[in-house]
């Protein structure tokens, strides 16, 4: 089945949903031929929107089809024997299942990442980038533009890492659930434009006789709007089944209002530098790899255990600060990185990736941050110790 998006002549291909490893030679060859055939069969399409590339984020269900574990940044589903063999040949040491299982925590973003896991992530980003570039080159060769959907099978294409610059992507579109998820899209550099897919999706769970799509649309727009004033996306859109939306004329009226507001905001903000009171650095073990995604477990969905931490990042998304994301290794490599920072924010449960754990036992780190504070810098930290149970 071919599903057009709501904007322009962008289309995506969705055959029966089966999982295959595009990294292997035969499936790789098949995928490239399939891409060329799709372009040839649809000459009227001018933008191909790839619903990302190759590897789904970690999502585990139990035998009753209940969602039991999710990590929107998780690499656990990107493992295969073929990939692991390549990894071992490159890094020179054998891969162990524990590098992924991680004592049952599956390397969620709260775990201080091991060297081996970071090696695996870097390897995946490099290999994913090679094939993405091949696909975008085919797209451009055929006179089309390539757009990436930020989500779903997006592991290895993190937009703030060096590998992303090599992908050849023309544009990025992603779902907008709040200010943080908007900045996750709008802060991307090196693309011609960015687009936010606003909520709600035109699906039966909201568009039914008991649903209130206007209420959900208002909440979504007001939540995301403040971040647009700091760093705007270039376009907005919605997604789903148009026939459902047509049954709610008051919703269509509100969408028209949202579009008009967006045009006004964009006309005033695009190309300008908003006023910044200070420069803030969010410090954790991930740095720019998790920029605007700190404490983000399942995109913008509320999580009881971390909503206070996620709320800090959400607040920053629309606050008058120049926000950067750094990790401890950045400071270790270059302590001068702190010279133009006014405030460091380091918040999370104790001994997690968001506070640093054993990184605070590194003398050079302690020296750099103490010197930063001595010279007038500020640091905001929040360490919560949780019981083993």
Model-derived segments and spans:
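Aromatic- and acidic-residue-enriched segments that line the glycan-binding/catalytic groove
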Residues: 1, 5, 54-106
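N-terminal accessory beta-strand-rich subdomains and adjacent acidic, glycine-rich linkers
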Residues: 1, 9-40, 216-217
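Single conserved hydrophobic/aromatic residue that forms the stacking wall/gate
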Residues: 2-8, 385-389
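The substrate-binding groove and active-site-proximal loops of carbohydrate-active enzymes
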Residues: 13-28, 113-128, 168-174, 206-214, ...
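Hydrophobic, aliphatic-enriched repeat segments that assemble into extended interaction scaffolds
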Residues: 28-69, 278-283, 373, 378-380
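Hydrophobic targeting/anchoring helices
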Residues: 36, 46-52, 58-60, 110-111, ...
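Loop/turn elements at helix/coil->beta-strand transitions in domains of secreted/extracellular proteins
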Residues: 43-47, 142-146, 232-233, 319-322, ...
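Helical hinge/lid and interdomain linker segments adjacent to catalytic or ligand-binding clefts
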Residues: 301-387
């Amino acid at each position: 089945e071919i599903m057009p998006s709501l904007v322009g002549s962008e289309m995506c291909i969705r055959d029966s949903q089966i999982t295959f490893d595009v990294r292997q030679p035969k499936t790789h060859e098949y995928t490239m031929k399939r891409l060329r055939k799709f372009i040839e069969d649809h000459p009227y399409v001018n933008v191909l929107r790839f619903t990302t590339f190759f590897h789904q984020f970690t999502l585990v269900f139990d035998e009753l089809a209940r969602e039991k574990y999710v990590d929107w940044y998780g690499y656990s589903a990107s493992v295969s024997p073929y990939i692991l063999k390549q990894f071992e040949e490159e890094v020179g040491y054998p891969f162990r299942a524990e590098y992924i299982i991680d004592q049952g925590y599956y390397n969620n973003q709260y775990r201080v990442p091991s060297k081996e896991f970071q090696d695996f992530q870097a390897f995946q980003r490099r290999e994913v980038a090679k094939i993405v570039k091949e696909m975008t080159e085919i797209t451009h060769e055929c006179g089309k533009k390539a757009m990436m959907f930020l989500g779903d099978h997006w592991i290895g294409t993190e937009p703030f890492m060096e590998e992303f610059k090599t992908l050849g992507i023309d544009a990025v579109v992603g779902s907008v659930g709040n200010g943080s998820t908007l900045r996750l899209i709008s802060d991307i550099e090196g693309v011609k434009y960015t687009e936010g897919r606003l909520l709600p999706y035109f699906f039966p769970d909201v568009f039914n006789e008991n649903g209130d799509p206007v209420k959900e649309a208002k909440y979504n727009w007001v939540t995301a709007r403040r971040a647009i004033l700091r760093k705007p996306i270039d376009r907005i859109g919605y997604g789903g089944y148009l026939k459902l939306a047509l049954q709610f004329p008051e919703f269509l009226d509100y969408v028209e209002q949202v579009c008009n507001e967006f045009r006004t905001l964009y006309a005033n903000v695009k190309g300008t530098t908003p006023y910044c009171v200070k420069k803030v650095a969010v410090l954790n073990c991930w740095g720019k790899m998790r920029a605007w995604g700190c404490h983000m477990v399942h995109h913008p969905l509320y999580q009881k255990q971390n909503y206070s931490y996620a709320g800090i990042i959400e607040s920053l998304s629309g606050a008058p600060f120049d926000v950067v994301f750094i990790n401890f290794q950045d400071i270790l490599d270059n302590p001068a990185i702190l010279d133009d920072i006014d405030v460091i924010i380091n918040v999370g449960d104790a001994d997690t990736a968001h506070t640093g754990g054993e990184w605070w036992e590194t003398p050079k780190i302690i020296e750099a941050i103490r010197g930063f504070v001595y010279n007038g810098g500020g640091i905001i930290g929040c360490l919560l110790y949780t019981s083993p149970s």
